[in-house]
């Protein structure tokens, strides 16, 4: 064939290595080749496997998952220093499981804090398992004292804002005169009464304006929202905290004052440590004018406090119809879409395109398998991946109604410190079972 060759002796090993495509450094006798041959030999494409680590936190990736062909995919929600993320998918697609895995794995970071606003108690087992606090906001045992710190002028200003937002919700026009009346009353009771008497009943008894008295009476022990009239606050924080909101969601008028108070208290514990705030069923937050404005403000400033907000909802419409849609879209650099076979329908396709997806990406979401596949996209890249969870992980993040009943039984019959032992017996796993 007219080929010239040389029988290698001293460089035999290097000659063989140089025949392996892409291994060009071992060839001491490099010959010119045309670009066609070069393209066939050069490793110019590969499956995107995600960032090797979380560069913002200088720590390992958040999650190691599996993608096409069992290739490793490293999931990180941070894009540079922005960790705000949105997770969207229809019911039964694995939303709660993924949120719990994000929460569980985020604990690997030094001094990490996790705060979950849950619906359906899907994160209760995980919260109890890691020794966190679980607050059921619809439980009669929950009590708040929002005026407890008004002896501090900054706290007094917040209390004024909180009370005025409640007036607006109750269709009371807030005039400068009303603000002055509330402020002077807050100042009076702050300088007159001890901390345990700084309650809603005290401020109502100190007011003279009938409109204010009748409106704020709802927040007292004799009103509909008596949880705000405690003389001692039951709210406390740990590094892993879950607030169950399902019952609260059924009382729409109390959602805003409750969440505004909790988020105000939450600001006190955000100290720059890596933190995430997970908002499950985020439509509740986006649908409320007072709270949506708070989220608009938070998304812009929490990044500087090393806090990531994760929105999760079952409906794209809830997000796109929100008056802060563009704020959420711009702030959430990472987006995770759950499998949705109806994604290719014309109405849904328009909604997905409003999130910046193209036809091919929408088709991937439509063809994905529910409860198994998730589609991540950001400016860094896109990847369909599978959490590929083992039995041990699923024992804590894959929770159903029967599991909730068993949890109630364990908490009733055993001390809290024995919860993990009893739960693992029930699930047939142990601390060393990672299969």
Regions found by a protein language model. Give the residues of each.
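Short hydrophobic alpha-helical runs that function as membrane-insertion/retention elements
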Residues: 6-7, 114-116, 133-136, 308-312, ...
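Conserved ASCE P-loop ATPase motor domains encompassing nucleic-acid-directed helicases/translocases
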Residues: 1-15
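Short, ordered loop/turn segments at secondary-structure junctions
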Residues: 10, 119-120, 139-140, 282, ...
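Hydrophobic anchor at the beta1->P-loop junction of P-loop NTPases
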Residues: 87
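P-loop NTPase motor domains
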Residues: 4, 17, 21-73, 79, ...
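A short, charged
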Residues: 97-119, 280, 409-435
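Walker A/P-loop NTP-binding active-site region of P-loop NTPases
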Residues: 93-146
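C-terminal regions of RecA-like/P-loop NTPase motor modules
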Residues: 12, 18-49, 90-91, 316-435
């Amino acid at each position: 064939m007219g080929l010239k060759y040389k029988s290698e002796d001293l460089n035999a090993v290097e000659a063989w290595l140089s025949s392996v495509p892409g291994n060009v450094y071992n060839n001491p006798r490099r010959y010119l080749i045309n670009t066609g041959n070069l393209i066939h030999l050069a490793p110019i494409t590969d499956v995107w496997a995600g960032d090797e680590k979380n560069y913002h936190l200088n720590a390992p990736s958040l999650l190691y998952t599996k993608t096409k062909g069992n290739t490793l995919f490293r999931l990180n929600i941070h894009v540079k220093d922005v960790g705000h993320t949105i997770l969207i998918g229809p019911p039964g697609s694995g939303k709660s499981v993924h949120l719990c895995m994000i929460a569980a794995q985020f604990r690997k970071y030094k001094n990490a804090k996790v705060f979950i606003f849950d619906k359906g108690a899907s994160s209760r087992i995980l919260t109890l398992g890691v020794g966190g606090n679980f607050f059921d906001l619809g439980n009669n045992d929950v009590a708040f004292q929002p005026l407890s710190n008004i002896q501090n002028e900054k706290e007094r200003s917040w209390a004024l804002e909180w009370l005025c937002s409640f007036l607006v919700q109750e269709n009371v026009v807030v005039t400068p005169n009303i603000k002055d009346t509330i402020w002077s009353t807050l100042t009076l009771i702050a300088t007159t009464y001890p901390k345990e008497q700084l309650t809603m009943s005290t401020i109502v008894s100190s007011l003279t304006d009938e409109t204010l008295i009748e409106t704020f009476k709802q927040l007292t022990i004799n009103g509909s929202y008596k949880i705000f009239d405690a003389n001692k606050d039951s709210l406390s924080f740990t590094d892993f905290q879950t607030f169950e909101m399902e019952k609260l969601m059924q009382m729409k008028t109390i959602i805003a004052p409750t969440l505004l108070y909790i988020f105000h208290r939450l600001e006190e514990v955000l100290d720059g440590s890596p933190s995430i705030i997970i908002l499950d069923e985020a439509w509740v937050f986006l649908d409320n004018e007072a709270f949506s404005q708070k989220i608009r403000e938070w998304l812009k400033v929490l990044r500087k406090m090393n806090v990531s907000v994760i929105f999760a909802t079952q409906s794209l419409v809830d997000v796109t119809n929100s008056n802060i849609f563009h704020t959420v879209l711009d702030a959430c650099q990472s987006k995770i879409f759950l499998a949705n076979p109806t994604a290719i329908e014309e109405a849904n396709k328009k909604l997905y395109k409003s999130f910046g997806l193209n036809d091919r990406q929408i088709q991937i979401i439509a063809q994905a398998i529910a409860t198994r596949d998730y589609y991540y996209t950001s400016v860094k890249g896109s990847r369909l991946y599978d959490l590929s969870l083992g039995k041990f992980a699923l024992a804590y993040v894959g929770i159903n109604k029967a599991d909730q009943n068993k949890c109630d039984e364990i908490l009733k019959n055993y001390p809290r410190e024995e919860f993990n032992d009893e739960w693992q017996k029930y699930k047939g796993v142990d601390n060393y079972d990672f299969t």
